[in-house]
């Protein structure tokens, strides 16, 4: 019974995501990403539902149903070891789950530092793509009917490393040449880390790091230890954080659809609870005193 129900749920998500695949991608740097101008316009590679050869970082907007949208926004960074993006299972399926919570999702295609011949770095280029995505969403908040003070990041595995690099580290100084979007804050209002990798865990968490929801499997030798370490650092710094470690669970259980364990299957419900408890799912909610960024950039 449970297997059949999960199969139907996965099939429905697959069909929905096939339609969602037609959604346009919004390029974050129309004239080419800094340092990647020579590869601007180069075609991506898609094998099954995995994407690689990304040189023009972009976000695909998956808007929540207008009848239930609450104004929250989440930028999703799929995993894939910085070699490819697990676009369906850790991108579009996650977007659909957030949409059911009334959240508008922005699925990020970022530059892949370990894609053969890419020449990119994780801490430099890929993290810059995530920061630009946060700024871009804030700049276009009015267009997509989201609250610029309720913009979160969500990262899976390698994407979790990017989320941590952006949320839990100081942003580097801006280059001499910037545009209006670059002048907005790149610090997300909250962070959701799904079996995040070890790169990006700070030596000491900052007291002004955004609230965190962290989830991993207890048998995940890659990503359970950094999940625990980051949680302990955030708590020590006085940052609100919640950690879920699921028993007998390994890596890459995605949004629960790859597991038969009920606790794994229902972990997105715990995320919904956390978002609600933090006030992120209601207009004007979230942390008090967070300044609103500048108006929309046209």
Residue positions per predicted region:
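Short beta-strand/loop motif that positions the catalytic acidic residue
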Residues: 214-216
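Primarily recognizes the serine-hydrolase "nucleophile elbow" in alpha/beta-hydrolase
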Residues: 128-208, 289-295
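Conserved alpha/beta-hydrolase "acid-adjacent" motif
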Residues: 221-227
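C-terminal catalytic histidine-bearing segment of alpha/beta-hydrolase fold enzymes
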Residues: 237-298
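Bacterial N-terminal signal peptides that target proteins for export
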Residues: 1-11
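Serine-hydrolase catalytic machinery in alpha/beta-hydrolase-like enzymes
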Residues: 26, 32-60, 65-74, 79-146, ...
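N-terminal signal peptide c-region/cleavage motif recognized by signal peptidases
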Residues: 17-19
